Amino acid sequence: VWCVAFPLIAIREMADSEEEFERIFKIVFATAGKNEFIEPFAKEGLRSWLGVPHEIGWNDPRLMGGYIKNILDTQFVPSELDAFTKDEVRIKVNVETFTGRFEMAPIDELILGYETLWHNMVKTLVSPEWSCWFEDKDEEEMTIVVGRKIDKRMV
């Protein structure tokens, strides 16, 4: 829990406003995401850990989708694969269950943190053309999507 709560507390104390907090928060989690799989051995280690055969290429969203699904399963967050293809991965999850597993972490920051982390992680794990985003965050059930999406900040 402290790995989530401590950065939130430290960043909130540094920021002068809510907008500044969100900006710094996104930078921290984006950097962490991009650095997660920057080394080739980390990618190969993940493939081995997940049991991904080499017939599945590197430019495949199922690598990131498998990682996310595994993280959710490890944290006992019930989730359902809606799509798991070479073109797109869609994982449905109950918002309250997703945010309720860390009692000390604020809900909005938890969703924003994971979305920012995984969005940038997929850029180095799979390819910069892939993105990860959450749909229906304000509903009872949200969908975590790994797919191709034009990211204007990356162009």
Predicted regions located by residue number:
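N-terminal accessory segment detector
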Residues: 1-90, 97-113, 117, 124, ...
